[in-house]
Regions:
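Short acidic/glycine-enriched loop/turn segments that link adjacent beta-strands
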Residues: 5-8
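Ribokinase/PfkB-type carbohydrate-kinase core domain
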Residues: 1-2, 14-99, 104-148, 179, ...
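Conserved phosphate-binding/catalytic region of the ribokinase-like
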Residues: 116-218
């Protein structure tokens, strides 16, 4: 795909406690055109990962409409800017019955609740699908009419860039390998804990191989 226009960039500021702040200048890489999907295989997918950043853009509605025509379980991670997504577009995503993957602050903000348990239940009532909430060092919790919990892995936080993306990616991988909900949450917590203990978003080859081996042995 080749587009006319300027590319964007993202500056990541990581503080001494590992917390990060992004300054993003969105370019053509955040845009979407429905005809792009005509050139790729669109057979049924196990999961379709939808990120809030792209949905927020002017072409986000076209993206949501295209995703609605695909066969597969949508997993939606709105991210911290998710509340900037137009309400009608957000409702269109909820109508796809996506798995929601959010952190605690996002769950409270999207639900309008003050406590995490009713917040999760409120989001589940809207989507009718699994809601996953990451809780930092306290692990993660999920709800689909039943509750699932998995403890976190103690670690020294160096850089939180990639914590959420690595968690949702690891969860998807674990589920595809046949792990049950609690096992998948635990594996995702482990991967995320290793990411935040490293500078940048890449694990060493040794870490990657160890995680792959662990996943295959479950």
């Amino acid at each position: 795909i080749s587009l006319e226009g300027a590319n964007g960039c993202c500056y990541c500021f990581v503080e001494s406690d590992g917390e990060r702040t992004f300054l993003s200048d969105h370019g053509v890489e955040y845009s979407f055109q429905a005809e792009w999907l005509k050139e790729i295989e669109t057979d049924p997918f196990d999961y379709i990962y939808l990120c809030g950043l792209e949905v927020e853009e002017p072409t986000g509605l076209a993206l949501v409409q295209s995703v609605s025509q695909l066969e597969g379980q949508v997993i939606f991670a709105p991210g911290p800017r998710g509340l900037l997504i137009p309400k009608d577009r957000l409702e269109a995503i909820y109508d796809l019955h996506p798995i929601l993957h959010v952190n605690e602050a996002e769950a409270l903000a999207f639900s309008g609740c003050r406590e995490i348990q009713p917040a999760i239940e409120h989001l589940y009532q809207r989507t009718g699908q699994l809601v996953i909430v990451t809780l930092g060092e306290n692990g993660a919790v999920a709800y689909d009419g039943n509750w699932y919990e998995a403890d976190g892995f103690p670690t020294e936080v160096v850089d939180t860039v990639g914590a959420g993306d690595s968690h949702v990616g690891a969860f998807i991988s674990a589920r595809l390998e046949g792990l049950d909900m609690t096992q998948a949450l635990r594996f995702a917590n482990k991967v995320s804990s290793q990411i935040v203990a490293s500078k940048g978003v890449h694990l060493t080859k040794e870490q990657q191989e160890a995680l792959r081996t662990e996943l295959k042995q479950k």
